[in-house]
């Protein structure tokens, strides 16, 4: 394969930047929508295709696996090749896979198309942020944070609502068609308005062994996390083999990266304090972002008797907090060029929000629950996107794709681990909590008369009870149990989020650049000559340090801000 060095192109106009940004945000929207729009209709889809519980699990897990595994690969390809072409390729893959999924006649074909959707989604999510760095400077990007929040809020909250409405009124197959117009418009907008520099070709080596080891190790790890406790016991031989196998594969990946000529993940990036602490923070953010959204929905359904659609609406305060606060903070970051106070405040709000959610019960005033969710959403909004921003601001421009995608990768990994771990804890706690309420349950059953036998059979079946259909005396007990059980998860997640507070406090307070990635490229920052031969990974790091092309920490002034490069434009 060939990689490239930039050749100067005319600057994009403000109108072209805004149109391209619209296309990028559409790409991000469809990648989010692909995962959320089917969530409320999956039982209908799997049943219609004559699938079982295994198929139900894999329809979800396959997309998660493909998205997570492909994210760092897309990031590396973005550093080696044509980013615009890669983004269009990801969008085209999504269009074809979504259209095909809508015509699925069995679960096997549906799962295969969901894998391709996941691969494309990983590309759209990673490449959108990388290309955004090409056309907007870190300083300028703050004022567009509200758009990110809006896309995330609409995609996350609106997806299940749209999917449920389509399934109820038309047909579940249209869930896979609904995002296609957005993807097609995104392709056209990007083709017409996104003008990135042409690149002079040079020979590079693809790290195929690294790709294979990382993909295998992460896949095994995510399958273990996603299915442990349900498909097999945590203390089983299968569990130990999967966990041990993933550790071995990932250890081999790390060893391989030291020797690779073009490593999939340049381990030298971990010498950059900003990158390292952003990765640590992102792991903990994943627990707050993904884990809490899953269990908040379960709280609404199991403890407050909401339907799946109602649960989506009831979690809107969290998305509203993310949208409103990230919009305000982004504008202030662009105006004043200061980011750290917002990020530290956000990390503290995450802990406060989780702690407050750890105090809720099944009958807590919903206004209070909404306030707690808003606080948590505000914290996530202040931290999550800014982690990508500060990393892109701090790393060498030729590692921007890898570094950006690594932050997303570790955030997803943290979210998956957090969801699996908290889910396992809930599965352990609920039976114990029900056992503690046996005397109350017996009294409630005694009031049911002829219905007692029917309710007893339902509870003894071992399946998750439909809380809303239970008689009120029994329903209140189960709502109380699930309310306290889910609240206990938030109480556990709160101290985990202290990791984010520590990590963001340790981030170097570097000044935001006023140059885009394209401008940095055109100045020759971080670029080896086009004719430079590939070098061995370990020796290559030393060579880059000697040549000054490996940036382990941005130059800093006495107050911790990085100095402005000569020739950098002033202002925002």
Please provide the spans of the model-predicted regions.
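A membrane-interface helix-boundary motif in multi-pass transporters
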Residues: 168-180, 227-239, 307, 428-494
């Amino acid at each position: 394969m060939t990689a490239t060095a930039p050749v100067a192109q005319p600057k994009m106009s403000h109108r072209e930047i805004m149109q391209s940004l619209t296309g990028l945000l559409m790409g991000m929207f469809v990648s989010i929508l692909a995962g959320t729009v089917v969530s409320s209709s999956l039982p209908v889809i799997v049943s219609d295709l004559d699938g079982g519980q295994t198929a139900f699990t894999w329809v979800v897990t396959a997309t998660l696996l493909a998205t997570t595994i492909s994210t760092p690969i897309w990031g590396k390809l973005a550093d080696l090749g044509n980013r615009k072409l890669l983004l269009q390729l990801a969008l085209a893959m999504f269009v074809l896979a979504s259209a095909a999924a809508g015509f699925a006649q069995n679960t096997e074909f549906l799962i295969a198309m969901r894998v391709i959707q996941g691969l494309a989604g990983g590309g759209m999510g990673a490449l959108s942020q990388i290309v955004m760095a090409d056309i907007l400077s870190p300083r300028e990007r703050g004022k567009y944070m509200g758009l990110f929040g809006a896309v995330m809020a609409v995609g996350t909250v609106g997806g299940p609502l749209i999917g449920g409405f389509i399934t109820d009124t038309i047909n579940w197959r249209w869930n896979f068609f609904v995002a296609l117009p957005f993807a097609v418009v995104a392709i056209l907008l990007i083709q017409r308005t996104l003008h990135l520099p042409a690149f002079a070709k040079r020979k590079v080596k693809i790290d195929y062994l690294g790709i294979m080891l990382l993909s295998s190790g992460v896949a095994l790890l995510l399958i273990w996390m996603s299915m442990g406790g349900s498909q097999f016991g945590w203390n089983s031989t299968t569990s130990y083999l999967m966990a041990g196998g993933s550790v071995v594969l990932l250890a081999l990946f790390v060893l391989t990266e030291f020797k690779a000529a073009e490593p999939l993940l340049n381990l030298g990036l971990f010498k950059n304090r900003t990158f390292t602490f952003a990765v640590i923070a992102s792991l903990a953010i994943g627990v707050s972002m993904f884990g809490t959204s899953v269990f908040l929905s379960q709280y609404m359904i199991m403890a407050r008797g909401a339907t799946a659609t109602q649960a989506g609406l009831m979690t809107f305060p969290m998305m509203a907090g993310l949208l409103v606060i990230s919009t305000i903070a982004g504008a202030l970051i662009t105006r004043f060029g200061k980011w750290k106070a917002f990020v530290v405040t956000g990390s503290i709000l995450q802990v406060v929000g989780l702690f407050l959610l750890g105090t809720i019960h099944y009958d807590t005033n919903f206004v209070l629950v909404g306030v707690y969710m808003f606080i948590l959403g505000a914290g996530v909004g202040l931290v999550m996107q800014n982690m990508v921003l500060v990393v892109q601001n701090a790393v060498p421009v030729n590692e921007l794709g890898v570094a950006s995608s690594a932050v997303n990768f570790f955030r997803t990994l943290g979210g998956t681990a957090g969801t699996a771990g908290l889910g396992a804890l809930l599965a352990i706690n609920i039976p114990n909590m029900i056992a503690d309420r046996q005397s109350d349950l017996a009294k409630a059953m005694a009031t049911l008369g002829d219905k007692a036998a029917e309710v007893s059979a339902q509870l003894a079946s071992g399946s998750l009870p439909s809380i809303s259909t239970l008689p009120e005396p029994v329903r209140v007990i189960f709502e109380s149990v699930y309310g306290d059980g889910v609240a206990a998860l938030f109480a556990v997640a709160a101290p985990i989020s202290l990791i984010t507070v520590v990590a963001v406090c340790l981030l170097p307070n570097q000044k935001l650049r006023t140059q885009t990635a394209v401008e940095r490229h055109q100045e020759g920052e971080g670029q080896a000559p086009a004719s430079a031969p590939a070098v061995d990974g370990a020796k290559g790091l030393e060579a880059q340090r000697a040549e000054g092309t490996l940036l382990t920490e941005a130059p800093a002034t006495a107050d911790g801000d990085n100095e402005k490069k000569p020739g950098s434009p002033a202002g925002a």
